[in-house]
Every structure is written in structure tokens, then in C-alpha cells.
Amino acid sequence: MTGQLVQYGRHRQRRSYARISEVLELPNLIEIQTSSYQWFLDEGLREMFQDISPIEDFTGNLSLEFIDYSLGEPKYSVDECKERDVTYAAPLRVKVRLINKETGEVKEQDVFMGDFPLMTETGTFVINGAERVIVSQLVRSPSVYYSGKVDKNGKRGFTATVIPNRGAWLEYETDAKDVVYVRIDRTRKLPVTVLLRALGFGSDQEITELLGDNEYLSNTLEKDNTDSTEKALLEIYERLRPGEPPTVENAKSLLVSRFFDPKRYDLANVGRYKINKKLHIKNRLFNQRLAETLVDPETGEILAAEGTILDRRTLDRILPYLEKNIGFKTAKPMGGVVEGDVELQSIKIYAPESEGERVINVIGNANITRDVKHITPGDILASISYFFNLLYKVGDTDDIDHLGNRRLRSVGELLQNQFRIGLSRMERVVRERMSIQDTNAITPQALINIRPVIAAIKEFFGSSQLSQFMDQTNPLAELTHKRRLSALGPGGLTRERAGFEVRDVHYSHYGRMCPIETPEGPNIGLINSLSSFAKVNEFGFIETPYRRVDPETGLVTGHVDYLTADEEDNYVVAQANMKLSEEGEFLDEDIVARFRGENIVTNKERIDYMDVSPKQVVSAATACIPFLENDDSNRALMGANMQRQAVPLMNPESPIVGTGMEYVSAKDSGAAVICKHPGIVERVEAREVWVRRYVEVDGQTVKGDLDRYKMQKFIRSNQGTCYNQRPIVSVGNEVVKGEILADGPSMELGELALGRNVLVGFMTWDGYNYEDAIIMSERLVKDDVYTSIHIEEYESEARDTKLGPEEITRDIPNVGEDALRNLDERGIIRVGAEVKDGDLLVGKVTPKGVTELTAEERLLHAIFGEKAREVRDTSLRVPHGGGGIILDVKVFNREDGDELPPGVNQLVRAYIVQKRKISEGDKMAGRHGNKGVISRILPEEDMPYLPDGTPIDIMLNPLGVPSRMNIGQVLELHLGMAARYLGIHIATPVFDGAREEDVWGTIEEAGMANDAKTILYDGRTGEPFDNRVSVGVMYMIKLAHMVDDKLHARSTGPYSLVTQQPLGGKAQFGGQRFGEMEVWALEAYGAAYTLQEILTVKSDDVIGRVKTYEAIVKGENVPEPGVPESFKVLIKELQSLGMDVKMMSSDDTEIEMRDTEDDDDHQSADKLNVEVETTKE
């Protein structure tokens, strides 16, 4: 027997074929959401209040400071919020201090700043009763980016951009004449020396001394028309503010506000970190030849003589001195934008590949501290120096798609940005109020208007592209949605603009973003999924774990380092499947490793790190595909995406052939009930589990408090599937923290269970499985194998109208007693009633416009009291295809104190549950992207059967395998059969699972035939089929594309208002479009009358269709069609262009065209009781 037994949770053992022992547990899979939100509550909010404090009025007399904040308790629990359609939120209170500097008076107050939405334990938000997820956004990190370009003559040049988090951009570029230009905030370009002069380096000599003499600089100086700081400032002002009279002072203040004012220009922590890293002098000195001798200024010791080549070792030796004091100098700009000296670090080197000894200056920005969030003159000088260095092949260009240059904005940061917008709007209001109100009577509460803050947060949660309605089809869909990374959204890319490069798989994605899981279609590559072991660091860069190799001994240690993409570029990383000894020594001399995206074979001394696990490359959903390594990536992509569409079944099964990820995914998804404290189970009911805690007291374990865990029973999920939790522990079980107490939907014994293990044969059967169609045995219908439960919610509200309030009642005009039999005395359907399409759910009447009564009606009214009530029937009825059993009814009344929207007096919700058995037209799939539609459900007795008489469950077309190259399904089939014979479950982790020989070994162990195929007998004749057939157990899932949701038929229904043609689509109860090609078909056939009927009375001949209906009802001949409405519309459009269009008959008389409004078709329709609806498109 190969493989070893592994325990997953309390109830499941699997035989695992993994060869690599995992040194690192999988992290909590929704940590990306929870930790980011926690950071926001702990630090993000505080940062915001510190940034905005103090708000001073225009005189500087009053100052408002935000001291501290606290979050209160939420008003309702999460479940109550879902029921009441309210937001799960807690009140935010801020301590505000108002100081009057004239009188020295200080007032402190706690100000309520609105209800702030809270994250649930499972990483979601409940907004207006619906669960939503905030998706993390992948954006370009603020930094300096250099890139090469080739112009049309083939000349090589460069461009560079300084991108802040918010604020103006600085761009540098070269032109064909080797002049270096700068653009300030996307304006017209200026020679770069103009910007240097504006910073205070006024003369040509100063600039040349600073940057070193080179032809690019002299070309630029020639092009530069300014010769002093003042002129440069005026030149820049004219470019930025054309048409305004320039003065030096205005120019200075403009540049200060554009670049050096922390309120207007923000690099954020990450921008400062990236700029310091990029512009540090050490990166450009590597492997260069010194043109000056480096001396330690403190001791006078020579560290490196002129002409020394700075290799890695020399550079490491002088690095501490570089950090401290070598090459530091202070430039003293005169009259520039920013007063004060500029700290720089400058070292001279010889230009590589230059004839003669050309010396170039390498200038660094002398490591500016992290709290300087705006750009400094030092940064600008260093970035310009880097640009000139690049022209001499010193330094590197940047790859914008590298994950070292793209970062994640998770929930916390997205919320913080939104909160910042709200606070800055509030700041304006506060300033205005400070100047208007009486300074003595003023209070913090009176100054602060919290509306803009609340509005900004509401807008973000309600309508931002990144705040999405949670995909709750099954636990895996839920988990994946929380780990999704989107490059779209505000401040990101748009679908149309994104090219191939952005969407492509990049080598830096390894271990950070899944190369498989991404949608098919226009969003491919723009929406990704976080890899299984990845984490996000403080700057928002994605890190992946690696095992450290001890440089002294060369042994692989258990120590794990998390590396970002740009850190990883400095190391050689070995694969996780390298053979190791017990001590951690590499057993092979030559090792396959990765370095900067290249796969190399190297000796073991060069290895710095090793992968922690083979599945660190892929996401949680992809890691659930067994034999992923044998599938083509396109099909694996479909497999990963389709698992998310699996409908929760009534009695699910976890896969016989799994990957070991099923337990972790289910546990972290938020669908299961997790034990919070260790203890012992005291009581188990369908609705709750009681656990008595264990508490440590003086080294003794004693029983403590009782925890009660409530189950969700038959709740409607966001997608209309059934969300139900079932306990899986028994009384007396000792449970530990983090153990699963109850299964959620699509779970069995604590493991993810999206489908069922069924007996599958690869064979054709009378052509019924042509083109991926699936033939299925009736047993799967009878035994409820693929039966799922669906819950739909319908609501009806009684509003106040201009003519009086609507009323929910049993007394509905023109409705017989038979239709009311399931309504209670209030006119609301009873729970448990079985309803069909068109049945009443809630009886409701709306007042009609009151007409003037005739004398007879007034007399009758006087005699009998109430007149025939002028009300319309606006009851809620079951829509087409919505029939089922009433699961629950909820009634909300304004009088009972329920919060309802304005104008609504009563709200009734009815939940209808449907049990959907599998049927022809339903879509099914395996986990390898092998999808198909059920074409035929055969009686059990007609299905082919095994020699022991067992009929198979499903027949798949063998032609679906070779061209698709998803061989994983065949391996799964055979291994599944062997496992069923052996009565075991199997784990075959991705990239480290069962090899071919393991599968053969297990087949042999199970006593199966040595080709793993079987003789099958035809169920109809009892004859054996000619060839042996591959039969085995495959895991098949039923997808959310069900035929019941798609089937649609219409006789009459709503019509469009303008063209009077039937609407389209099932949602509008529309018709089928008879298009251009269908018309050609009937023309070719010569079916003139059928065609005329389709184009007129069945479509938009308004009078004709009513008369036709009338004729059919009365049993008369169908009359001649009239003029279609769309023809009238055409004539009206031509008339609107000023053409006089008339319609003439064959005898030259004008045909009158009546407008629809004057027609009497509505009256005749009323007599016939035909509904003629018109709908605005």
C-alpha cells in the first residue's frame, strides 16, 4: 500500500499520496479581510483624525482637534439585521476639543459621527439586510518608474514618472535630439533644467557641478531659455497657469502647494518606502567602477580606492558606511521654491562601455525618513540623476506588471480613503461655520456636520464597484469571493483600456496570485485570486513564504520567511519537491531552481530559499482539483470557476478522491459553525449546540461557562439556494478550539461537499451524448441524488397613494372564493400551503381615481351605504415557474414600531421553497472543466450494467477527453473506482499527489482488472458491448444553470410603449424575437400568410391583435391585419425630419392613420377582459 492515513477533522480519514511533508500550516484563508478591517479600526481611523487635526478658521483664532474615538455596541445582532433589512453597524463617537486662542477657553465634547458598518466574524458586511464583500484592489504602487522606449527611427530613449498616492505627477522624457524634458502634472514639456533652476540651482555651473558634465545635460541647457531661478519660476507658472499674470511669489506658492504641501501631495508610507528603495545609491553602484577614492570621514581609512569594481562582497562591506556618512554633501540652493539646504549623497563612477574615462555622478536622496510623506527637492534631484545615469546604462528600468510594483488596497485602506473624502468635505463646512457663528457661544457639536461623512461611507458600501453582493452559492464561492483581487474599480484599470500585458501571468505571481483561477471573458486576468499561502504586508504588497537555507551549513531549516516579489528577485529559490535528507540537506548536487523568472539548474551551494509547499502556487479553489498536474490549464480554469457555481444538494457527499483542501476550505469559508473555546458538548439539537467551556484554574482544568451555538435553518442565501446548518458532534464529545461543530450547506462531516460520487462510464449511447451531452440514469432522480432546495423571496408593500392608502385584505374584487382558500383573515398566504403559478400570495387593493357618480348611483349609494368600492386588485401573485411550498411569511407593520421606508405602511414577505430534482437541460460538470448538459434520463433498466449487475449512473462521451487534454478526469475515474472497492477516501494534493504508478498500485490492491476497464452489458438487449469500457467513480456537481430558471413561454403579455412590440426576455415576460434571418426562411418557403401574421397581429398591429383575440374567443374567422405600429413610428420619424409622408392606396386615395390614443381597442379589450399592458422600455 502506498500513501499514509491522514485525519481531517473529527470524522474523516483519507489516504494521502503526498510525499512532501508540510512545514507550514495553511493560514486562515479570510485573514486578508479581517486583519485589514481590524487595522482600520485600530490605526486607520486614528491616522485620519490626526491628518485632519487641527481644523483652524481663516483667522487662526479657533482650532478644532479630534482627540480620540470609540465604537459603541451595535443595535441589532447580525441575524436581526438580515431580518429587518438594516445595516449591521455600531455608533462612532469622537472626542473633539475646541480651543479659542484669544480667550484660552477649551471646550471638549463627545460628538456622534454616524453608524459605522462592522465586519462580521466571517469577513462580510451586512448592508441593508444583504451580505456584501469588499473586494481587494490591485493598483500601481506610488513610486518612481523608469521605462525604455524606442522611437520611430529606432533610437533608444527613456521615460520616467514619479507617481504619488495623490497629487501631481512628474514625468521625464528624452527626445530625438537627446534633450531631457520634464512635464509637471500632464502639462506641456519643459527642459528639465528649468525645474532644477526653480529649486534654487540657478546657474549652468551649479547644475553641471551637481549632475556631472555630459552631452545630454549640455543639450538640455542649450534648449533652456531661462538663466536664473526667477525666470525659471515664471516659466513654470506660465505653463501651469496660462493666462494669469506671473509673479515669482505666486510661482513659488504654486509649486509648494503642488509638491511640498503634505495636504495636497501624499506618497503614503508605501510611496516613501519605494522611492527611498529605488533612489538609494547602492542599487546603481553594484558592479560599477569607482572614479573616486572612498574614505571614512571619521577615521580617514580608505574603504575603496579609485578604479575598484564594486562587486556584491565589496558593496556589502562598505554598505554600513554608505548608510552613515560616505558621499553625503549639502547643497545650498538660493532663492528656490523650498527654503533650506538639500541633503544629498553623491559618488562618482566611470560610465560602463564608454570610450575614454567618462565620469558620471550618481546621486541618491540621502534616505529621507518615513514620516516625510511628500516629495522633497532631494527626491527630485535623485530621480533626475537616476534618469541621466540610465542614459549611460547605469540603473534598471522597471516592469510595471511586476508584483513588486503593484500593491493591494484591502478593505481597511479603501474605507480609509472613503472616510478621508467625507472628512475633507466636513472640514470645509466646519471652517465656514467657524467664521459665521458667534465665537463665544460656539460648541464642537454645532460646528461639525456629520452628513458628508455618513454619505461618503454609505456611497462606498452601497454603490462602489468594489463593494459586491456576496456570491453565496456554496461555501467555496463565499471563500473565493473574499480572497478576490480586482484590478478594476476607482483608481484602477478599465476593461477596455487593459492590454494583454496586464492580464498575463507574470513570474512574480508565483505563490502570490493564482495563475489558474480567473474569469473567462472580458475580465480575464484583471480579476484574480490570492494564492493559498500568500499574505499581505503593511505596505500592501503580497508576500509568499519560503523555507530559509542556512548559508553556513547549506541545510534547509524550518525557519520560514515571507518575501515580497522584489525581495525574491535577489534570491535563488528551489522547488518544494527537491529531495532532502533527515537533517535538511539537499540529496542532489544539481538543483532545479528559479531566479528572476528563469528556471535554472544550479549547484546546491547557490540556493538561498526553498518553496514551503507545492500548492503555494495556486488558490484555494484550484487546490481542490485532484490531478491538477494532469490537466490543461484552460480546462483547469473552467474547473476552478465551475466549482463555485455548484448548487448545494439535499444530501451532499465529500469526494472520494479529494486533495485534502476540502476540510480547510469548508472551515475557513464561514459557512460552518466553529467552536470558539475548548470544552465538552452538553446538548445537541437541530437548532443549537451547547458546549461547556474548559477553564484553567491553578493548573487544574475545570468546567466554566456555557456557550450556545445557534444553527441557521433553511435560510435563503443571496443566490436563492438553501442555507442550512446541521450539527455533526454528539453529546459527550470533547471539542477543541477551531473544531467544526456543524456542517453548513455543501458540506459533509466537516468537509466541502459540492456534488456526489457517481459511477461513470466513458462510452457513446445512440448518439445521445454527442457534443458533451450527458446521459443519466433515472436512479439519480428517484433517489434524490442531485436534488437541491431553492428558496425564493417575494415581497409586497402597502403604500400611501395620492388617492388614499393601499390595503392588504382578503376582500379582493372579482376573485372567487376558491382562489382565496389558502389566505388567512388578513389576506396573507398561510405557511405550508402549496402554491402554483398565478396563485395569490398577498391580497392587496389600491384605490382607483374617484369618478363623478350618476343620479342612480347616488340613490343606490344612499340606500345601500357603501358604493361599489373603487379599488383595483394589485395583489402579489406567484410568478411563472415560482410555484412551491410556503416556507415562511414575515409581516412588518409601521404601527408595531418596525422601521419601514417612507410611505410604506405594511410590508409582507413570503418565502417559497422548491425541491428541484435533476432534469434534462440541467448543466453538470466534473472538477476538470468537463461540463455538459443532460440530454436524456434513461430508465435504470436501459442503462449499461457491470458484470455484477450494477447499472452505471452516467455516460460521458469519450471524445470529450483527448482534444481537451484534461486527463485528470481519467485518473480520478480509475482511482475513485479502486477507492470505492477498498472502502477508503483518498487525498491527492495538487502537484504532489498520486503518480501513475500509485494509481496502478491502488487498482491492483483493489483487485481490479489490469487495464482498469470493464465489460459492460447493454441494458436493452443484455448483450455485452464490443469493447471494454473505462468505468469508475467520478465526482460530478450540479451547476447553478438549471433548466427551470431558463424555460419560458408567453401567449400575450406586456408590450413596449413606443413600438407596441412585445418586450424581450424572461424577466419581462417577453416574446421570442422573430429576426431578419427567420423572416428570410419564411420568405424562401413562401409561407406568406404565416409571415404576415407574425409581423402584424402577433407583434405590433394594436387593433388587429385585439380583434384577432376577439375572433378566436368568439370562434369567428381571423380578420385582415391593419397597419403595424412600428410603421406609424417610422412615418412620424420621417415627418419629424420635415418630410411630408403620406400613405396612399392603390387607387391613389390617402389612407388615414389613426393614432393609438384615439383607438377604441382598449374599450373592446375591457369588454373581453383581455389585459393589454404597455410598458416603457
UniProtKB/Swiss-Prot annotation:
PROSITE patterns documented for this protein: RNA_POL_BETA
Compositionally biased region (Acidic residues): 1147-1161
UniProt key word Transferase: yes
EC number: 2.7.7.6
Pfam family, one: RNA_pol_Rpb2_1
Record carries keyword Transcription: yes
GO cellular component, as recorded: DNA-directed RNA polymerase complex
Comp. bias (Basic and acidic residues): 1162-1177
Keywords: DNA-directed RNA polymerase, Nucleotidyltransferase, Transcription, Transferase
GO molecular function annotations of the record: DNA binding; DNA-directed RNA polymerase activity; ribonucleoside binding
GO biological process, one term: DNA-templated transcription
Catalytic activity: RNA(n) + a ribonucleoside 5'-triphosphate = RNA(n+1) + diphosphate
Broadest EC class assigned to this enzyme: transferase
Region (Disordered): 1147-1177
Domain of life of the organism encoding this protein: Bacteria
The protein's role, per its UniProt record: DNA-dependent RNA polymerase catalyzes the transcription of DNA into RNA using the four ribonucleoside triphosphates as substrates.
PANTHER family, alphabetized: DNA-DIRECTED RNA POLYMERASE I SUBUNIT 2
Similarity field: Belongs to the RNA polymerase beta chain family.
Subunit structure, interactors included: The RNAP catalytic core consists of 2 alpha, 1 beta, 1 beta' and 1 omega subunit. When a sigma factor is associated with the core the holoenzyme is formed, which can initiate transcription.
UniProt-recorded name of the protein: DNA-directed RNA polymerase subunit beta
The species this protein was found in: Bacillus anthracis
The gene coding this protein: rpoB
